[in-house]
Design a protein with these regions (language model features):
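N-terminal secretory signal peptides
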Residues: 1-8
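Long, histidine/aromatic-enriched segments associated with O2/redox biology
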Residues: 12-31, 39-425
């Protein structure tokens, strides 16, 4: 029995009650740049779904979901045709799963009885829960470390897909850095996100191998004005000044690659930077509130700048404090990261909290899995991170242990596949 869609149950509705109708409205703004009517918002949060095909890949301006499974793959020693075949298979499976369907042609409990199921089945009763699946290509997909043109696409590597520099203070683990291909699966149910990566990994067997992956929870940014600003594991509101889907002019300027931006195949796409940032939780928890707020440059409760106002009041970096020094310290995070002090540089943040248990000393292995999308990393992330790495007061409480960059192509047309213009135009 063919099955394009799982049987959807309301069993998970109560656990997903936090997915508000407002998130559905934000989804319409992100995808179509105009808010849908109320009838477009599903009564059951588990039924929330976003189109897979379109001008842009979903999972960028889509309202940030609550859960993440991020996976990075290295492509095996295969011919170009096999890489294209993998991308085609991934596209078909991702499109099905994003609509609440099976990864394969048959549902997990259907198909040939003496063959392995085409879908692992753990998401059968959960619904799509807002699942988005976003694909990206790393620098090493274009050119190997020894300079080899692996798949005949070295001359099509975009100028903006630079090798990220090693920033001051970086303590990078190469095992969780870099990579040929990335998949970002976001959903409001963690099992749905894990199911997506699990099945795409299974489909890749013999063609690409999992290099590393990361689970995330509690989004640390809002990509829609319908969403409240979340908090990171330091307890502060995070991403107050983030780009929002409801400002399409700013998104066009800072996120989407234009036709004239170098490689035409990247039009409608973006560049993704990932950074795994471990927080020194225990020292932070023993730090005075006054020092915490000084390091951030905002109040812990309401997220207002120390210069006054509410969360969304523009910081006054010239306002004097005690002793005549600026009330927002010169090394405060908000000052160093703010667009006003970075020549207007902006990016769309889409990060998540993570907790990977404890280390051997009993310290919490936790922090921020930072994700950001931008039109050109050399004009946004790289200069901003260079400033932060140099003097941010938060550096005492953080360690950057993973780093990667990916070219995220524009969305696929139905019947085509993600990245088709790279290989076929």
């Amino acid at each position: 029995m063919a099955a394009d869609t799982f049987r959807i149950s309301r069993r998970r509705a109560l656990s997903l009650a936090g997915v508000s109708a407002a998130a559905g409205v934000g989804a319409g703004v992100a995808a179509g740049r105009s808010a849908p009517d109320a009838s477009a918002v599903p009564a059951d949060p588990a039924a929330l779904k976003y189109p897979f095909y379109g001008e842009h890949q979903a999972g960028i301006t889509t309202p940030a979901q609550d859960r993440l499974h991020f996976a990075v793959f290295d492509v095996d020693d295969i011919p170009r045709e096999e890489l294209i075949s993998l991308l085609q298979d991934w596209t078909i499976a991702a499109a099905r799963m994003s609509q609440g369907g099976s990864a394969g042609e048959f549902a997990p409990d259907a198909g040939p009885y003496e063959a392995p199921p085409e879908d692992t089945g753990e998401a059968m009763d959960l619904g799509p829960t807002g699942l988005t699946i976003t694909f990206g290509f790393g620098p090493t997909l274009f050119t190997a470390a020894d300079g080899t043109d692996r798949f005949g696409i070295a001359d099509r590597r975009p100028r903006a897909l630079v090798d990220l520099p090693r920033f001051s203070g970086d303590m990078l683990d190469e095992r969780i850095s870099g990579g040929d291909l990335c998949i970002q699966a976001c959903a409001d149910d963690p099992q749905v996100a894990v199911h997506a990566i699990r099945n795409l990994s299974r489909i890749a067997f013999g063609r690409a191998s999992l290099r590393y992956s990361q689970l995330g929870f509690g989004r640390t940014s809002s990509t829609s004005t319908a969403q409240v600003t979340p908090r990171n594991l330091f307890g502060f509101k995070d991403g107050t000044a983030n780009l929002k889907a409801e400002d399409p002019a700013a998104v066009d300027e800072h996120v989407w690659v234009a036709d004239s931006d170098d490689q035409a195949w990247m039009a409608g796409g973006s560049y993704l930077v990932s950074r795994k940032i471990r927080m020194n939780i225990e020292p932070w928890d023993r730090t005075r509130l006054s020092e915490q707020e000084r390091a951030i440059g905002r109040t812990k409760g309401h997220g207002a700048p120390l210069s006054g106002g509410d969360e969304f009041t523009a910081p006054d970096f010239s306002m004097p404090g005690s002793g005549g020094k600026p009330i927002i310290a010169e090394q405060a995070h908000v000052r160093l990261a703010h667009p006003d002090t970075n020549g207007g540089a902006r990016m769309l943040r889409r990060g998540y909290n993570f907790v990977d248990g404890n280390d051997d000393l009993g310290r919490l292995n936790a922090g921020l899995f930072f994700l950001c999308f931008q039109r050109d990393p050399e004009r946004s992330f790289i200069p901003v991170q260079t400033r932060l790495a140099g003097s941010d007061l938060l550096n005492e409480y953080t360690r950057h242990v993973g780093s990667a960059i990916f070219a995220v192509p524009g969305g696929a047309a139905e019947g085509s596949y993600v990245g088709a213009r790279l290989f076929e135009s």
